Curated annotation (Swiss-Prot):
It comes from Lycosa singoriensis. This is U13-lycotoxin-Ls1f. Expressed by the venom gland. The keyword Magnesium does not apply. Residues 56-95 form the Agouti domain.
Amino acid sequence: MKILFVLISILYAVYCFSSEEDVDSAYLANELEPVEDINSEQYAALEPKEEQERSCAGMGQDCKDDCDCCLNIATCNCWFGRYFCSCTFGDYQTCLRKKGKCKRNRPQSCPRSNLNRKKG
């Protein structure tokens, strides 16, 4: 069975290479016209579109307050008071504070850590 499979594979490979050579030689002899891609305009490079401003900032991006950060537990951490602010990881209390304070990007639920719970 294995020998039959190998034999069929070899015959198929020879057939593929021979038919490819026929097409190449016919193309070089101008017997075949080049095929035009009908959908070539579809794949043409389009003008780059301007990015729209996101409603929230991802981790490490600039922010003004906690409500600007996307994640439920993300907080806006600022260096030197109000300078160089960016979204960083917070905790469960951050999520609760955002739930009460934020109108946009308000967390639906706050994840609790499973580290302190006993399994048993």
